Structures are given as structure tokens and as C-alpha cells.
Amino acid sequence: MSIATTIVKNTPIFGRMFAVAKSTGLEEINAWPALMIMSSFVWLVVAGLLGLVMPATQIFDLSSDHFYTTLTLHGAALTFPFSFQLMMGVGLHRSGGCVGKAITGWLPALTWLTMNLGAAILTVAVLMGLKVSVIVMFPLPLVGAQMGVWSMESVIVGFTGIYLVLFCMIFCYPLLVLK
């Protein structure tokens, strides 16, 4: 049993939805893509809950700071770990199934880890005060740090998370498809 199968199997609720069948002999093709797809739906639930919190911050007249924190967390969770990871998992599942090559080894593990670790690090940066809109990028991260809107540490932590996600998508994923 692979590490990916074990993680999927031991995950409450989602583990049963994305269970990897070992009896078919396709575990090597399905395990890592199933873990990536399952992880993307976990992030979707997180993003959905944050999406419900956004109007609540306005209804209860909380600080606009809370609204922008929630907005940034919601956008980052939908963009990076949900959308990118879902595309990656489905793509690897199809490429493994069509070509018949196993998706095993250190590269799929690195891909899954960098995607989720990068998203978690970006989440920490937002909680540290980085509140950049994913779409508009206003104010620019360095300008916001120079103006005192957020700290330079949150910018560094945020870009570290974004770097890990982009490394996963630009470098690791194409290597997995070509492998």
C-alpha cells in the first residue's frame, strides 16, 4: 500500500469518497491523483466556509480588516490548492490511465507536498497580515510593506508559499506528465 493510499484511506469523510481500489491492480496509477483530487476538495470546503464568513463580517459590522483577510483567504484557497490541484489530479489520472504508466516515486509526493505546503504557507502569510487581492494585486505587495499596510515578513512568507505552488505547477507537474 502506497503512502498516498494510506493518507486517502485515513482521511475522514473524503477518504471514503476517493478510496483507491487495490483489487483492480490500478493502485499505482490512481493513488497519487486520488490524493490530489481529495486534497483539492478539502481546500474547496475550506474556501466555501470562508466564503460564508465574508458576508457575516459585514452583517455583524466587524472590522473591514476581517473582511479583507477572509476575502484574501477565500480567493487564495480557491485559486491555488483547489483549482490548480484539481486540474493536476485529474490530468495525472487521465494521463496515467491512457498511457498506462504508474504514477509513483518521489516526484508525485514532492508535487503534492509542495502544492499543499505552499498553500498552507500562503495562508499563514495572510493571517500575518498580507491582504493582497489575487485579481487586482493592489496595493502591490512591496508597496504595501513600504507603506506599513503589512509587514515585509508577511510578504516574504506569502511569496514563499506562492513560489512552492508555482514550482509544483510549472516544474513538477509537467515532469510527471512527461514521465
Name every feature range the model reports, one short phrase each.
Residues 1-179:
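Hydrophobic alpha-helical transmembrane segments of multi-pass integral membrane proteins
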